[in-house]
Design a protein with these regions (language model features):
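Enzymes that bind and transform nitrogen-containing heteroaromatic metabolites
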Residues: 1-244
Length: 244
C-alpha cells in the first residue's frame, strides 16, 4: 500500500452548504464579512499543515486568471518530478491536469506552489514553471491519478498533513476515492439559497453512483467561534467502496 499524507477536508460554507462567499447574507452584527470569514483562516493556520490543496478553477478565480496555451507548443516527453523553490514552511498544491494556469509568482500568501499535472502538457509549459521556480509532479497520463500524486507528496516532498480546501468538484473527487480522513467544517451564519451554486462536495457522476458510499462520519468536536461561526470536526470511517 502506498504511503499517503493525512488529508483533512477543511471547508468554509454557508448554513445551506454553499461555497461562494460573496453571495452569502451579511453578518447579523454589522461586522465586515471579511473579518468574520477570517475565522476559517485562523483555524486553518492552527493545523500547522505541510500544505493545502486547491483545484485549477479556484486558483484562476482568486489568484492567477490568465491561461497558458499549450496547444501551439511541443508535447512533453519526460515526466519526472521537479523541485523548485522550497523556502516556505507550508506549500500550496494545485491540481491543474492540463497545465492551464499562467502563474505570475511562485507563491500564494507566502506559500510555495507545487503544480500537479497530467502528461498532456507542453515542454514549454514545464520550462515556464521551472523559470518561475514552481515545483511540479505528474498524476498519471490524464492528471487524475490522485493516489500517485499524494504518494509523491508524501515520499518526495515529506508531506504528512495536508488540508483539502476545494473547490467543490475537487472535494467530491477526493471523497469518491476515499482519500479524506477528517472533515473540518466551518459554518458561517449566512445563506445563499440559489439552486446550482457550488456546494461542499460535488461529484459529477451518474444517478446510479454513490460517491460517499462506505464512509461514515463520527463527530469528534464542535465549537462555537466568534460572530456566530460554528466549527464541526468529523472523523471519516471508510469501508471498500464497491457500490458503483
Amino acid at each position: 500500500m502506498k504511503r499517503l499524507p493525512k488529508i483533512i477536508s477543511h471547508i468554509n460554507s454557508s448554513v445551506d452548504g454553499r461555497l461562494v462567499a460573496d453571495r452569502w447574507t451579511l453578518p447579523f452584527n454589522g461586522k465586515d464579512i471579511e473579518d468574520v470569514l477570517s475565522v476559517y483562516t485562523e483555524i486553518k493556520d492552527g493545523y500547522s499543515a505541510d500544505a493545502w490543496i486547491l483545484g485549477r478553477n479556484s486558483v484562476q478565480k482568486h489568484f492567477f486568471s490568465e491561461t497558458f496555451d499549450n496547444g501551439t507548443f511541443t508535447s512533453a516527453t519526460t515526466f519526472q518530478t521537479y523541485i523548485g523553490h522550497r523556502d516556505s514552511k507550508r506549500s500550496l498544491v494545485i491540481f491543474d491536469s492540463k497545465g492551464l494556469i499562467r502563474y505570475t509568482d511562485d507563491k500564494v500568501y507566502g506559500d510555495n506552489i507545487i503544480a500537479v499535472l497530467g502528461e498532456n502538457v507542453s515542454e514549454e509549459y514545464l520550462e515556464f514553471l521551472r523559470q518561475t521556480g514552481i515545483s511540479y509532479l505528474f498524476a498519471g497520463a490524464d492528471g487524475y491519478d490522485y493516489e500517485k500524486a499524494l504518494h509523491i507528496l508524501y515520499d518526495e516532498f515529506a508531506m504528512r498533513l495536508v488540508l483539502l480546501d476545494g473547490g467543490g468538484m475537487l472535494n467530491g473527487l477526493f471523497l469518491k476515492k476515499q482519500f479524506i480522513d477528517e472533515l473540518s467544517l466551518v459554518i458561517y451564519s449566512g445563506i445563499d439559497a440559489l439552486s446550482g451554486i457550488s456546494s461542499i462536495y460535488e461529484y459529477k457522476g451518474k444517478d446510479c453512483e454513490y460517491p460517499a458510499y462506505g464512509q461514515s462520519l463520527e463527530l469528534m468536536d464542535m465549537k462555537q467561534c466568534r460572530d456566530g461561526v460554528i466549527w464541526l470536526k468529523y472523523k471519516i470511517h471508510k469501508k471498500d467502496n464497491n457500490h458503483e
